[in-house]
Amino acid sequence: MDFYTTDINKNVVPLFSKGTVARTASKAQYPSWCNNALKLTNILLKSLRCKFQTNRCEDDRGFEVYCVILKSIALLMAAKESLILLQIPPSLPSGFPFRSPQLSFTYLSTRLSGSQHKSTHSHHINHQTHPIHSSSSNSNSNNRIPTKTDSSKQHTQHFSFANAGASNRDELLSIVRKIDKSNLKCCDCGSTATVEWVSINLLCILCIKCSGVHRSLGSHISKIRSLTLDNFTSLELMHLLQNNVSNSNVNAIYESNLRNFPVKKITANSDDSERSKFIIDKYQFKKFVIDSNQGREASLKSLIKAIHLDSVFMMQRAIAQSKYSLRELTASEKEQNDLNHSSIFQYSLKHYEIVDGTPIFFITEFLLCNGIHIDNLPKITTNWSPKVLEYWETKLEMYGTFQAVNTSRPRSGPHLNMHSNVDSASSYNKKHDLRVNIPERSASASKRWSLSSIPKSSQNLMSPTNLLTMHKSLKLAKKDKK
């Protein structure tokens, strides 16, 4: 088995000539040694995170302590990445695309200046771990620090709202607001009134006015749900809502280049036209995103790296910076790779978190919310656990059947880009005898309305005068009979 490490340039390189390290990794006690090192790193990170959150930068001395803690966290994260890289072979199959020294890791920026004092103090760094794959969300995006919740809170805040009542939905709203202080205000206009709407694919919370504009964009751009009215039955979606909704993270991506435009951010008092134009430029055209024109290869590399590190923030950034939609990326990736290579969808299924003995496929769920293609169930299932296959089958039944039905519907909108997975859905339906009754459509059925039902002759048209005359004639006829 090959092992991997990082070189001086922080790139992934094979660990075949590292002497003592390679021999240690090949010994039987390697798993216990690695797990103990990870546990120690997690303990140190947890302690530093507590110090980081409680420390206040009210004076120069406090800011110096703040910088020391931040640098220590960065060093520990770098050490933890080295430990994670030793576990790449179990999670990254042989022949997976882009497994090369170009798959480099970005590190948390420790270059803080006085001008960044206020902006960074409002963020907090938390780290998420699980037994299968350790995660690290250390990304250097315009000197903004992504926000994640504490791993200890993730296990205590994971609820099932299958039969959610009003009190439970209010509790969910309270949890989402406590994740990040930025969630107390609307992500787009900063309003504090009725901030109860969430975009489940963008992972931001909105006011009722901005949520209406998001709905008009289409579900392929923003999927809007109500935190107080809708029921969330998916464990994976609940995990994302309870741990990854952050307005500051979304604005760090979609407003990263806003200062270079003469456009001002909208406020709660902005009119409807200003609000609509700003939100369309922000999310549909990605006008304020830095480097939002990445090609397929660069986008796929960023996406694979984000999945490997279990970083939702990095996946958000990879999707935002690509000039292609996630559906287009995965479709092209599926065409380029042969059947012996794992797809991005299959690779994401190997990254999950165990909560109370149940695997939570939150990485795959986030990708599904953003339109990733779903593969057919494999013919050989020996390499997949029953829980993975169960989740896979459920999502294929949900999204695959839905796409098969939607293939008969006309596309609307000049910017709508929906490529349906017809072959995968139809083959899956035949295998599992999922019968979907789709009415046959005529040649003119693609039109919303037709002129065929309107009579060509004007004589057949009834005017109000003709109706009145007919009404009188009927009365006269009745009198004649009497």
From Swiss-Prot:
PANTHER family named among the record's database cross-references? ADP-RIBOSYLATION FACTOR GTPASE-ACTIVATING PROTEIN EFFECTOR PROTEIN 1, CENTAURIN/ARF
Main localisation: cytoplasm
Q: Which PROSITE patterns match?
A: ARFGAP
Instruction: Quote the InterPro entries the UniProt record gives.
Output: ACAP1/2/3-like, ARFGAP/RecO, ArfGAP_dom, ArfGAP_dom_sf
Keyword set for this entry?
A: Cytoplasm, GTPase activation, Metal-binding, Protein transport, Transport, Zinc, Zinc-finger
User: What's the name of its gene?
Assistant: AGE1
Start and end residues of each Arf-GAP domain: 170-297
Q: Where in the cell is it found?
A: Cytoplasm
Native organism is: Saccharomyces cerevisiae (strain ATCC 204508 / S288c)
Q: Which residues form the signal peptide?
A: none
Composition bias type Low complexity, residue spans: 134-143
- Organism's domain of life? Eukaryota
Q: What is this protein called?
A: ADP-ribosylation factor GTPase-activating protein effector protein 1
- Pfam families per the UniProt record, alphabetical: ArfGap
Q: Tell me the function of this protein.
A: GTPase-activating protein (GAP) for the ADP ribosylation factors ARF1 and ARF2. May be involved in the endocytic pathway.
Tell me if Transmembrane helix is a UniProt keyword of this record: no
Disulfide bonds, paired cysteine numbers: none
Q: Name one GO molecular function term.
A: zinc ion binding
Basic residues compositional bias, start-end: 118-127
Q: What is the lineage of its organism?
A: Eukaryota, Fungi, Dikarya, Ascomycota, Saccharomycotina
Question: What's an example GO cellular component term for this entry?
Answer: trans-Golgi network
UniProt-annotated stretches for the region Disordered: 116-156
Give positions of the C4-type zinc fingers: 186-210
Which biological process annotations from GO are given for this protein? endoplasmic reticulum to Golgi vesicle-mediated transport; intra-Golgi vesicle-mediated transport; protein transport
